[in-house]
Every structure is written in C-alpha cells, then in structure tokens.
C-alpha cells in the first residue's frame, strides 16, 4: 500500500508541475491562447535582442473609433531572405481586433496572430476598434524571430 501511495503522490506532483508551469510554443501558422505564456520556436530560449513594437495606438482613444496598427519586431536570428522570418500574437483586453489580409488571422475579437502565409515577414498591419466606453485597455504582444531552418538552433 505504501508503494502505491508514494507512486500516486509522485504522479500528482509531476502533473501539478506540468499544469503550473506555462508552456510556450509556436507554429508556422500561428497559435492562439498564448497571451500569458508567449511563444518560441523549437524550445529556443527567449532573447532580449528581439524588440517587439506596436505602432498606431493613440495615447487616448475616441470611443468606437478604428485605428490602423502595425505590429513588428527587430533583432534576433531573423534575416531578410529567410523562408520564414517569424510571427506574432497580439491580445487586447478591450475593443476588437481585425485583420487586413491573409498574413494574419483572428482567433477571437481580442486575439490575433500570424498565418503560415505571414510567417515570412517581420511586420503585420491590423485594425483595432476602441471600446464604446471609457475603460483602460491592455495589449500583450509576443513576437517570434526565427532562422527558418527548422533545426531548433535559434528558431
């Protein structure tokens, strides 16, 4: 009996650890639901040489107004001419996001990411429609700069 109890406790601790530690992953066609965990490629370690940016957001918004925004990144292993350069995931706490072309996809009104057609670039243009009421809005942007060689060395 003691051996079973010990085995059950070890299994419970292992499962709890897997659930408690957020995993980060990425796919060539994008991935939804990573606003907290972020994304990386082939288990690569996140790098502070990759600098994400969001352009086009106002300091203060007008209710229900639509803004053109550009999400992009600089740095990391991504190089012009790579088959794949990277991707992104953007989440907004309020308002609604929309895609402008086939390089990005809408997961839900608060969440958008790159598509497989859009993983050969480092910049994507989207739209964000502000909420109809006065409220604080948070944005979480994750980007993934990759080598495109699929070998796990730097993405």
Question: Residue ranges of each PLM-predicted region?
Answer:
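Sequence context surrounding c-type heme c attachment/ligation sites in exported
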Residues: 2-7, 16-155
């Amino acid at each position: 009996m003691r051996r079973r109890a010990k085995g059950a406790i070890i299994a419970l601790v292992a499962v709890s650890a897997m659930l408690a530690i957020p995993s980060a992953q990425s796919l060539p066609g994008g991935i939804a639901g990573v606003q907290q965990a972020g994304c990386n490629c082939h288990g690569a370690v996140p790098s502070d040489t990759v600098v994400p940016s969001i352009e086009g957001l106002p300091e203060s918004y007008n209710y229900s107004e639509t803004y053109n925004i550009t999400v992009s990144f600089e740095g990391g292993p991504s190089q012009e001419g790579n088959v794949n350069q990277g991707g992104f995931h953007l989440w907004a706490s309020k308002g609604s996001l929309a895609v402008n072309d086939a390089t990005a996809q809408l997961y839900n009104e608060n969440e958008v990411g790159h598509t497989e057609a859009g993983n050969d670039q480092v910049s994507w243009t989207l739209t964000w429609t502000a909420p109809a009421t006065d409220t604080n809005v948070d944005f979480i942007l994750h980007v993934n700069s990759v080598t495109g060689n699929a070998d796990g060395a730097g993405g």
